Amino acid sequence: HSRCALWISDAEHAPLTPISGYPDLDIRWPAHAIIGTKGFDFIDGLDEATYDYQVFKGIEADKHPYGACYHDLKDTLSTGAIEYLRCHGITTVICGGLATDYCVKNTVLQLKAAGFDVILNKAACRGIAPETIASAMQEMAAAGVKFVECAKELAE
């Protein structure tokens, strides 16, 4: 994300408080995944040079999209992820990430809406709060998402 993002919480604006006046912002968040910081980098063990396609989302100061498939909250400005997957004949996507109850949930639901089979690796996810995680898991299950506890289950 941008260091100048309008959604970053501060002493006057607590995290998770509403923002108005910007169509692609809804609530404030602590600064995270800022370009040029460790939080923006791939985790150890994932070599970005081995990937054919990377999505950079939320780098604009006035946007904080949750899903990886669109740059906006209305799901109209594509990141190209859906098109890339379709072009390469991919029909199943395995997901994980941060945060289960926001970005992961929205990405998974965007992929399901686009017609993909989606598997959520629960061990590869972390969320914000138990209540919102539970709600997100229910919403994803209702959409037909499959769940595995860990990657080993995928090999079985």
Walk through the language-model features, giving the residues of each.
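Active-site alpha/beta core segments
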Residues: 1-92
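Gly/Ser/Thr-rich loops at beta-strand to alpha-helix junctions
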Residues: 99-103
